[in-house]
Curated annotation (Swiss-Prot):
One of its GO terms (biological process) is proteolysis. Recognizes and hydrolyzes the peptide bond at the C-terminal Gly of ubiquitin. Involved in the processing of poly-ubiquitin precursors as well as that of ubiquitinated proteins. One of its GO terms (molecular function) is cysteine-type deubiquitinase activity. The gene is UBP9. This is Ubiquitin carboxyl-terminal hydrolase 9. It is an enzyme of class 3 (hydrolase). Pfam families: DUSP, UCH.
Length: 910
């Protein structure tokens, strides 16, 4: 597919371009507004790389005055649209496939079709990545763009060949038949397509059905099987894997430790060694109705959960709930009388039934793993935010599931209206009990009984001193990590005077800090002199992507996986102009002048950047600056040759001295530098790297905001200089997939809880209306624990959010496995025990988007811990439970002897 070049289109008058960035911004804004006003299913959207879109946003944000005068450092118009950083490297240009686990507004943006058309007219580029708008949800219909269509692996039963089929999840079974038959050339009346999940025939798909693929429980990357009437191979396959397979019992594990399947990759692909049409009897679809009763000595609760395509987050949360003793006990009994099918806040009992069915299968005998397909389908129906195949947050899924189960099991069929009374200086215990009873009068379920507690909230008006006290229920405690206040960043410093090799520095800066904070920390780390400054820039694809010149800009705009450099410069004298010189490095098989508009030029390494003040600038001046930069990279034993017109050599010392004059002295006139041959082949180029003009010593260059040149490296230069120092820039923050990190900077769960309970002012967007002042005030808020539940869940807030990105904190949190004593944090003193022990953990490994969830859970009766990694289950030592991957902690109350006796007496009376 050939996309026309924007330069060609301008030259030939193919399209009319906006005359200013402001006009361009206005046109796009109007098109976006028009699209939002006319939302309908099937509208087309296009995926654009966030990197390119950010450069475009900065371009159109400048004023017309800045653009015309050239005063803005962001005046450069972006090059062609470039989506190559978000598509698979081996992707077909005519059918580009997005990389897995990308995040919207972090890796890509979505624009309506009309906006895409305009951007392509103005900039060209691509490749185009088209997606459709779909409508989903049960009670509340919402629109969303299906960024990742359903990917199915089609196995042809005739020859066992495999083909990838891509369709939207809302496509019908009928459409699936049409696509498969068109692809294979099989008449539709002879085709039979099976749901072949886990290489087992789970059901024949009806060729005439308009049921969607999602409603049919087909999931990302799963197998489907094509059988053709009259084919001997298909007949053989049918006889060996037909419906009689359902009669084959699952063989119970003969080991005390169930190892189910193998490790599952975080993108939803399971590792398998050999492909076969014959089934592996290792897993069970949760749609099955058969259950086996646990025999004597058999263990339940050791079944894994198959990954259905980035569902490790769901599997982790489900395993933690599936090992919560009171919840397991409740759902393994008959709970049908508690199902509330008429609750408008519930899901007609369907979510509770799906969860209960899944729980029974996880605790039945002979289970190696369970495929939670029916549960996933119900979840997507009632919570469209969890539909599709993007990675999600296990805590967010847990919060929705607990709330949904409560509403489906709420015994209160008709909620009474209760007018809340003012506290009127009454004792706290009286008000708290009254509000808890009000809450219970409208909310009565096993979830409330087991998982909900109560905290005290105190607000103090900063103006009049009015105190407001309320008591509110909670399902879990989301506690901050004190380390979220800071952030470590690694930046590579380049010395423009050639005094040192490029050096990476890692500094600690405020999480919500500014560019000034980073420059100050870097300056301290690299011993920056008073007459020196640092110029920060992001390097992408071996070019300068953007500069960070506004000291007040937020650090949140810098992502952890970006490559940031700082150029150490001598400060320019006051009154002198500042023009940037960017030196790019290139090398390719054909000489640059023989390349076609730069397409054969292969860039490498990190650009050199400095300020220059000689006007006009000559080729010899640039050569001198380049030699200065390269001087510390000179190999000790490299051959040294003076340039003679055909061979390159390093410059004599006089040239290196000239460079410092160009960089620091605005009044220096360089007369003798232009009399020499250049030591490198240097080309003047544009910001897109499409045009090249060879430079000679005497070449005269007018300076703009940024002057870009390209240096052509050949084998001789690589022999003379160690170019490895220009490559392999470290990321701002490299997140390790391993959770076993140093615990030097560990914090305790208690310090997290204390940060959660600490008094703090409300945010400006969360003002409190003071009933005394009759004004919204930024009051001070203080939380205290009042009533704790039997099951206490701590959510460690490892993920922080800003306008530009999400960030993860990998700090190790030291949490007790036994004897978590919360007595001193509970204001309501009574005879209850506030001692807890850990029984489950939801873990998150790696960074955002590309991470993976697992779970630790304890079989309490056996006092043994197990690791649940999707379908893989293994025993684990208790000492391994505590690591920096811990994300959600599940504790159960350890009752005192008095409480235990009271509970036993109550049970006997019932």
């Amino acid at each position: 597919m050939t996309i026309p070049n924007s330069d060609f289109m301008i030259e030939n008058g193919v399209c009319d371009f906006p005359t200013t960035p402001e006009e361009e911004k206005r046109i796009v804004s109007e098109l976006i507004t028009e699209s939002e006003d006319n939302l309908k299913e099937g509208n087309l959207y296009f995926v654009i790389s966030k990197r390119w879109y950010t450069s475009w946003e900065k371009y159109v944000e400048q004023s017309t005055k800045e653009y015309i005068s050239g005063e803005s450092s962001e005046a450069s118009r972006p090059g062609p649209i470039d989506n190559h950083d978000i598509i698979e490297s081996e992707s077909d240009v005519n059918d580009p496939q997005l990389r897995r686990l990308l995040m919207e507004r972090v890796d890509y943006v979505l624009v309506p079709q009309e906006v895409w058309k305009r951007l392509v007219e103005w900039y060209s580029g691509g490749p185009p990545i088209e997606r459709k708008l779909i409508c989903q949800g049960f009670y509340t219909r919402s629109y969303s763009v299906e960024v990742y269509p359903l990917c199915l692996m089609l196995t042809d039963g005739r020859d066992e060949s495999r083909t990838v089929i891509r369709l939207g999840k809302q496509a019908s079974i009928r459409e699936l038949y049409e696509k498969v038959c068109a692809l294979t050339g099989v008449p539709q009346e002879k085709a039979h397509i099976w749901d072949y999940f886990d290489k087992r025939k789970n059901g024949l798909l009806d060729s005439l059905s308009y049921k969607s693929l999602e409603e049919s429980s087909l999931h990302m990357d799963q197998d489907i099987l094509l059988e053709v009437d009259g084919s001997s191979s298909s007949q053989s396959a049918m006889s060996s894997t037909g419906n009689e397979l359902a009669l084959v019992p699952l063989e119970p594990s003969r080991s005390s430790v169930t190892i189910a399947g193998g490790p599952t990759l975080s993108n939803g692909h399971s590792t398998t060694s050999n492909f076969s049409l014959f089934p592996r009897i290792t897993s069970e679809d949760d749609g099955s109705n058969s259950l086996s009763i646990l025999g004597k000595g058999e263990k339940g609760g050791l079944a894994g959960l198959s990954n259905l395509g980035n569902t490790c987050f769901m599997n982790s949360a489900l395993q933690c709930l599936a090992h919560t003793p009171p919840i397991v006990e409740y759902f393994l009994q008959d709970y049908s009388d508690d199902i509330n099918r008429d609750n408008p806040l519930g899901m007609c009992g369907e979510l509770a039934i799906a969860f209960g069915d899944l729980l029974k299968k996880l605790w039945s005998s002979g289970r190696n793993s369970v495929a939670p397909r029916a549960f996933k389908t119900k979840l997507a129906r009632f919570a469209p935010q969890f539909s599709g195949y993007n990675q999600h947050d296990s805590q967010e899924l847990l919060a929705f599931l607990l709330d949904g189960l409560h509403e489906d099991l709420n015994k209160v069929k008709r909620k009474p209206y209760i007018e809340l009374k003012d506290s009127d200086s009454r004792p706290d215990d009286e008000v708290a009990e009254e509000l808890w009873n009000y809450h219970k009068a409208r909310n009565d379920s096993v979830i409330v009984d087991v998982c909900q507690g109560q905290y005290k909230s105190t607000l103090v008006c900063p103006a009049c001193g009015k105190i407001s006290i309320t008591f509110d229920p909670f399902m879990y405690l989301s506690v901050p990590l004190p380390s979220t206040l800071t952030r470590s960043m690694t930046v590579t410093v380049f010395y423009c005077d050639g005094s040192h090799l490029p050096m990476p520095y890692t500094v600690i800066v405020p999480k919500n800090g500014s560019i000034r904070d980073l420059i100050t920390a870097l300056g301290t780390a690299c011993l920056l002199a008073e007459d020196e400054s640092l110029l920060l820039a992001e390097v992408y694809d071996h070019k300068i992507f953007k500069y960070f010149e506004n000291p007040l800009d937020s650090l949140s705009s810098i992502k952890d996986d970006e490559h940031i450099v700082a150029y150490r410069l001598n400060q320019m004298p006051k009154g002198s102009g500042k023009a940037k010189l960017e030196i790019l490095h290139g090398g390719q098989k054909r000489p640059i002048l023989e390349s076609v508009r730069g397409r054969d030029v292969k860039l490498f390494g990190t650009p050199f950047v400095t300020y220059v003040n000689t006007e006009p600038l000559s080729g010899a001046d640039i050569d001198a600056v380049l030699s200065r930069f390269l001087s510390p990279l000179h190999k000790v034993h490299a051959p040294s040759k003076i340039h003679n017109g055909s061979e390159n050599g390093h410059l004599p010392d006089a040239t290196v001295d000239e460079a410092s004059e160009i960089l620091s002295s605005p009044d220096t006139e360089i007369d003798d530098a232009s009399d020499r041959e250049l030591s490198f082949r240097i080309f003047l180029t544009d910001e897109r790297g499409l045009n090249f003009k060879p430079l000679q010593s005497e070449s005269s260059i007018s300076l703009g905001i940024a002057t870009r040149v390209l240096v052509e490296w050949n084998e001789g230069e690589h022999e003379r200089y160690d170019s490895s120092y220009l490559s392999d820039l470290p990321e701002v923050h490299k997140t390790s997939f391993s959770a076993k990190k140093t615990r030097q900077e560990s914090i305790s769960l208690f310090s997290c809880l204390e940060a959660f309970l600490a008094e703090e002012p409300l945010g400006p967007d969360d003002m409190w209306f003071c009933p005394s002042c009759k004004e919204h005030r930024q009051a001070n808020k203080k939380l205290d624990l009042w009533k704790l539940p039997d099951i206490l869940v701590f959510h460690l807030k490892r993920f922080t959010y800003s306008r530009y990105l999400k960030n993860k904190i990998d700090t190790f949190v030291n949490f007790p496995v036994h004897d978590l004593d919360l007595s001193k944090y509970v204001k309501n003193k009574n005879d209850q025990s506030y001692l807890y022990e850990l029984y489950a953990v939801s873990n998150h490994y790696g960074g955002l988007g590309g991470g993976h969830y697992t779970a630790y859970a304890k079989l309490i009766d056996d006092n043994e811990w197990y690791h649940f990694d999707d379908s893989h289950v293994s025993s684990v030592n208790e000492s391994e439970i505590k690591n920096s991957a811990a994300y959600v902690l599940f504790y159960r109350r350890v009752r005192s002897e008095t409480e235990t006796q009271t509970v036993e007496m109550s049970t006997d009376m019932d």
